[in-house]
From Swiss-Prot:
Function (record text): Required for normal embryo development.
Domain of life of the source: Eukaryota
InterPro entries registered for this protein in UniProt: Centromere_KNL-2_homolog, SANTA
Residue ranges annotated for the SANTA domain, each copy included: 66-153
Biological source species: Arabidopsis thaliana (Mouse-ear cress)
PANTHER family: KINETOCHORE-ASSOCIATED PROTEIN KNL-2 HOMOLOG (PTHR35311), PROTEIN EMBRYO DEFECTIVE 1674 (PTHR35311:SF1)
Keyword Metal-binding: no
Keyword field contains Lyase: no
This protein's UniProt keywords: Developmental protein
Residue ranges with Polar residues bias: 1-14, 24-41
Full protein name: Protein EMBRYO DEFECTIVE 1674
Amino acid sequence: MTTTRAKSKFQSLSACRFTPLPEPNTSPSTYSKTLPKPNSSPGTDGTFPTPFPLAVITPIKTLKSVTLSDWWLTKKGKDLCIKGFESNGASGVRLFSSGTISKRHESTTLEAIDGITISINGFINRSRCLENGISIEVCNRFRLGFPYDWEDYNEEEEEKKKKNVDISFDDIPVNRYQDLYSLEGCLKDKILDDVVGSLRDLVCQKSDKACEKSRVGDVDDDDDDDDDKSLVSRVVGVKTRGMLRRREEYEASIGKRVATMSGKRVVTVSKKKNRRRSFGW
């Protein structure tokens, strides 16, 4: 009995040891999903088709000339550069980044500082230019290519930067705010009066010169009596307080002259009458 049991155990162990494993199911549903092959161009260099990341930049060591179908402007400090897509036919499309533009052969043919000749086709890409800090005015000037006065771009941009200096209240220190708020009302009014007075003086100087010119012309053309009337009626200047005050003073002086002239005439007439009476005429 013991021997038969031992044989049966040995047979069961050998059967478990030598039993072949079941074959795997080779149905298509059990295959692992493979990544699709990249959609590479027929060329041998394996470049990416568009769209592709802008980090893929064409090496420019071996290039002598480049033709860009889509181009835009960039800046390196104060200098202008060009970026764009280079079309190589079967090789695909690559991104080209130039050095500083040093020479203009034609509006669409340029030369970089490293000696590469760049030909551009089509209109400028405005959206790319704006992303790189180029203004709309410059985009309009470089719309079809480089104008003949393209080198003046840097000077104009520098002048605009100097003129367009933004002044903000944040630039004023806090202690100045405190000084302004602590001023008394009379001092503020005095400062305002000084500012208005300086502006008034500037306006009066210009208007006085115009009045003098008109007075000289009127004196040469008319008589003395007509001059006084014409000066009063024709003087037209900036209507400020200073001008009105001077006009009133001038009219008053003219009135005094007329009064003195009429007074002298009355005195002479009365003297003549007295003489006639004394002689009995």
